[in-house]
């Protein structure tokens, strides 16, 4: 028997454009007519060459930039039409991990050290952080 229920996307990006005015005569089309869906439970990677618009797409998707045109829907609602309360709730649910090529990975640190660092910064003891990291690494098959 076929499942006829249509799955609704959690995130929909529709015809997203973000242009930057470089001068009165020149416009940089950082993102030009991008459309895609993300469904609950999916892991999505946006990959491409340096300068192709990956970070601009992410920044626009979480409202750090206003789009030139297009829409971003989260759970069926246009994020650019959120009221104050909806915006606060949205900020609790989404985040962007900014890329920094100069601090990406420290070759002197193990995966355990890197993952545990954030836990310790939030007040977790070294013993508890180590145990949590071991559990997480085992969960994803990196033990």
Positions of the model-derived regions?
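ABC transporter nucleotide-binding domains
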Residues: 1-143
């Amino acid at each position: 028997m076929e499942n006829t229920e249509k799955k609704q996307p959690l995130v929909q990006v529709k015809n997203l454009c973000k242009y930057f005015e470089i001068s009165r005569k020149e416009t940089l089309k950082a993102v030009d007519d991008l459309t895609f869906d993300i469904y609950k439970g999916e892991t999505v990677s946006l990959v491409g060459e340096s300068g192709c618009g990956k970070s601009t797409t992410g920044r626009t998707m979480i409202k750090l930039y206003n789009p030139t045109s297009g829409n971003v829907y989260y759970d069926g609602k246009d994020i650019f039409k959120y009221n104050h309360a909806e915006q606060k709730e949205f900020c609790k649910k989404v985040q962007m991990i900014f890329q920094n090529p100069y601090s990406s990975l420290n070759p002197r640190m193990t995966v355990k050290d890197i993952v545990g660092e954030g836990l310790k910064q939030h007040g977790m003891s070294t013993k508890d952080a180590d145990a949590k990291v071991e559990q997480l690494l085992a969960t994803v098959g990196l033990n």
